[in-house]
Structure formats: C-alpha cells, structure tokens
Amino acid sequence: MELKRVVVTGLGAVTPLGNTPEETWAAMVEGKSGAAPITQFDASLFKTQFACEVKNLNVNDWIDRKEARKLDRYTQLALIAAMQGVKDCGLDLETANKNRIGVVFGVGIGGIKTFEEEVTYYGKHPENGPKFNPFFIPKMIADIASGHISIHFGFHGPNYTTTSACASSTNALADAFNLIRLGKADMIVSGGAESAICACGVGGFNAMKALSTRNDDPEHASRPFSASRDGFVMGEGAGCLILEELEHAKARGAKIYAEMVGEGESADAYHITASHPEGLGAKLVMEAALEDAGLKPEDIDYINVHGTSTHVGDISEAKAIKEVFGDAAFKLNISSTKSMTGHLLGAAGAVEAMACVLSVKNDIVPPTINHEEGDEDPELDYSLNFTFNKAQKREVRAALSNTFGFGGHNACVIFKKYAE
C-alpha cells in the first residue's frame, strides 16, 4: 500500500506569548518570555509564585458566554485554537465532506481546575451534601476538548484524545498523520491543550521539586542548558495544526506551510518522572522518526528539543542528540522554546511543532533565551549550537520536535519544506 502524503494547511495557537499563531511566532523570534507572577489564584504561600499564563484573552470573543461556562479553561483554549486553525486552512464548511474530517487532540491532565473547584467546595461544605455541578464530569474529563471541537464543526471522522503527559499532543499529531497517510481521513484537526495553573497543579509540581522557584526574576527562570537552571516554568495554552492529505489540499487550492514526513514513539522504561540518564528513550524515538521519514541525520537543520530546564533532562537529551546525529549534531541548530512559553504540558508538543513548521517556512530558528556567559554546565557540550538568546537565520530544510512525558513516554515528529 502506498502511503499518502500529509501537509500542514492551517495553524492555531493561544499561548503565553500571544493569542494567535502570528503573535506567538513573532514573540518567539524576538526572544520574549511569557513568565510573570501568577494571577489565576493566590500563590503567595507557594514555593513557586509565577507561571506562563495566557494573557488578555477574551474567551467570549470566540465562545458564547453561556457555552463557555460549561467548559473548563483547557477546553476553551483548545476550541479557540481549533477555530483559528480551521479558519486559517480556508476550508469551505458548506461543501466539505465532514465524514472524512476528524479531530485528534492531546491533553496531559484535563480539567484539573474544575476538579479542584468542585472538590474544594464540597470539602469546605460537607454539611450541604454532595451538591456537584451537573457539568462537573463533562468539564473535567480529558477527552472532552476533542469532543467539543468535533461538535462545533460537525466533523464526523475519527475523534479522540491522546494522553501521555507532556508527549500528549505530539502523540496526537503522530496519530493524525498516520490516519491520513493510511487513507482513513482527508483532514485531521490535531494539536493539544492544557491549563493547570491552579493550587493543585502548582502545588503538586512543587511537591515534586519540579518547578523553578526563581520568584524574584520570573522572566529569566526558564533557562534550558544553563548551569543555574532550577526546574521548569509552568505554562498553559493550546496549539492546533490542520493536517491534510496532499491531493485533497491541492484540489481545494489550500496554502501549504510544510509537509509532515515522519513520527516516532518510544519508552524510557526507567522512572516515572526522570529521563533515562543516558537518553536511551530519546535516542530511540529520534531514530524511529528519522527512519519513518526516510531522512538521514544530516538532513535535519533544526531540533526543537524537549528542553524543560531540568538538570537531568537537558543533559540526557543533549547526549541523545550527539549519539543519533554524530558529526551532523554540530551543524544543526537546537533550541528550547520552553525558555519563552514555559512548559505547556499536554499542549507543549503542538505549540513546538508549530514552531518547527514556521521555522521551516521562514528559514529562521527561534532562540533558547536566558543563557548568560559563565553559566555553562560542565556536563554539557557547548560545541552544540543551542541558539542562545537570539534567533538565527538559516536554511531549514527539515525540523524535528521532541517531547517526553512523565511515565517515560517519548514522541517525535518531523516536518520538511513542501516540494512537488
């Protein structure tokens, strides 16, 4: 069976850097940080009091006020990003064969804010009995964002959610890619969303000592590949990529951002939260994606790394890149856009895939910000080009995106310039 080709024809994004793909990409290229003191709850007693929040978003510009109240914030963000993506791809909803269009979205946690609100209320007022909101369960469950997107547009194709912690939306893109190239759909609205900046989310990650506590300087807290890194910065947001079968896209005259050419998955099988210290799973997943794409290491010009700004994770990923890419590792660009967006958890893979697509389209690599001279980690090889502090213009023929999740889940996707 000859596999069909898959292209990216639309983008959507709501992130700490901007409420559209254009705003987000411009801020990435400029090296802006989305970190600031937390506004969504009183974090004054928490070890970490800052995060990368979505800012200045009026949800009711996109979603009817009454409907918005039925949605957890993560679902609101997912639906808005999907609306942007579908609009951007230029699909005629009146004539489209909606039976051949699906939705595959990734979510790492789901409606944790809704869960916190409902359970906290009951815990404070048990004498009132179990008076739960009838939308408690539908707002909370992790699969509901893809369901709302499908319902909103009337898409009857494959519809489900992938959940693999921080690899969730990369797994969603991989599944969407495979559904299309196997001929099971013409178009998939894919991506991911997360919004867990609440007491449970921040408190839980604080208890694990996973978050940066640089409360006096939030904008410089996320600093992947620097010796003074002290944990990741929590973020929220959503990203959407419209993946489409090439001939279907050409037939309707769609613009094409890039071609998706490969994906890979692997497991560390090592620890519930820590990366394998030698980067075993990272090595396996990049090798799998390259093989799937039919590309050699020297064909990749940019790697958007998982790069969360944790001690073990950054070192192990850099080791894996050197092992997989050999001499080519020193000729490509590496960057972590988490230095700007923070860690978007289940949405990370989608937003970082978008960064890869736009890097391929525009021949520019966004930076890894916040590195300072003299802040080198002796366990890292700075012969690698981490694209510190300033975007770099270069030809980007193909870009690879890594995402790794708690539980040892690893996923990788590759995009390249579209050519007939």
Regions found by a protein language model. Name each.
Residues 1-67, 89, 247-259, 354-368, ...:
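ACP-dependent fatty acid/polyketide chain-elongation machinery
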Residues 1-8, 95-98, 293-299, 330, ...:
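Flexible, low-complexity linker/loop segments at domain and module junctions
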Residues 5-9, 36, 216-293, 302, ...:
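Condensing-enzyme catalytic core mediating Claisen C-C bond formation in acyl metabolism
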Residues 8, 24, 32-164, 193-204, ...:
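Conserved beta-ketoacyl condensing-enzyme motif
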Residues 39, 184-230, 263-277, 307-315, ...:
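Acyl-CoA/ACP chain-elongation machinery
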Residues 78-91, 145-146, 150-153, 159-194, ...:
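Active-site-proximal alpha-helical scaffold in enzymes
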Residues 124-133, 174, 178, 194-251, ...:
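Glycine-/small-residue-rich "gating" segment that lines the acyl/pantetheine channel
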